[in-house]
Swiss-Prot record:
GO CC annotations on file: extracellular space; membrane
Descriptive protein name: C-X-C motif chemokine 16
Coarse class of the protein's main subcellular location: membrane
Family: Belongs to the intercrine alpha (chemokine CxC) family.
Side of membrane Extracellular, spans: 27-198
Upper lineage: Eukaryota, Metazoa, Chordata, Craniata, Vertebrata
Length: 247
């Protein structure tokens, strides 16, 4: 008869099983291999700039394992020595939110978008406007746009001249605003003229119908009068019998 496992063997089995499933400390992973890396870069290896920029752009998070640091990208994980220069730079960049998914794009956008902080002072009563500030604002606005968009720059400059200058920044721009307003009124007037022109055929048609109805009424009245007069003549006519001739 076979004897089962004793208490000592069962205890040793549970002890080794607990060692295999023991979780790691923080982000270091576990002994079972939760710090698995798809690609491990040996220490002292020179990283190409293109590869490093790719990692900065698509970095999601990183984990501090026991002897290395694992960087989790979108499709794979890359591990490197914790003492390597590129590893420390990448960790520092991600911790300061200067790279990674969602961080690097906003940082790149803030880096390339110019900040226009120039403001135009409002004109006060009794004080002439500061033309130097207006010229400085115009030059700043022109330098903000790239050289490949001249039409947009011209449209914005024209809009700035027609909206800001007529409010008291220059008398020379008032005729331009008045001409624009006059042109706007002229554009509205053809619409009213078109409505009047559309009513003319309708009125003409109504007049023609009225004259036709009047002519038909006159014709019917004339026919009735003619019939009545002919019947009256028949009533007034009395036939006369011929007298008998004497023998």
């Amino acid at each position: 008869m076979r004897r089962g496992f004793g208490p000592l063997a069962l205890t040793l089995f549970l002890f080794f099983f607990a060692l295999l499933t023991l979780p790691g400390d923080g982000n270091q992973g576990s002994v079972a291999g939760s710090c698995y890396c798809d690609r491990t870069i040996p220490s002292g290896t020179q990283i190409p700039p293109a590869t490093l920029n790719h990692m900065r752009k698509y970095l999601k998070t990183f984990h501090r394992c026991q002897f290395f640091i694992r960087f989790q990208l979108q499709s794979k994980s890359v591990c490197g020595g914790s003492q390597d220069q590129w590893v420390r730079e990448l960790v520092n960049c991600f911790e300061h939110k200067q790279c990674g998914i969602g961080h690097g794009q906003s940082f790149h956008h803030q880096k390339h978008v110019p900040q226009a902080s120039t403001r135009i002072p409002e004109a006060t009563e009794g004080k002439p406007p500061d033309t130097s500030t207006a010229v400085q604002f115009q030059s700043t606005q022109q330098s903000t746009f790239p050289s490949g968009a001249p039409s947009l720059n011209k449209e914005l400059t024209r809009h700035w001249e027609t909206t800001i200058l007529p409010s008291g920044y220059g008398l020379e721009a008032r005729p331009v605003a008045e001409a624009n307003e006059k042109q706007h009124k002229q554009q509205k007037e053809p619409g009213a003229g078109a409505g009047t022109q559309a009513l003319v055929p309708v009125l003409s048609l109504l007049a023609i119908v009225f004259f036709l109805v009047a002519a038909m009424v006159c014709v019917l009245c004339n026919r009735r009068v003619t019939r009545q007069s002919s019947s009256g003549l028949q009533l007034c006519y009395t036939p006369v019998e011929p007298r008998p001739q004497g023998l």
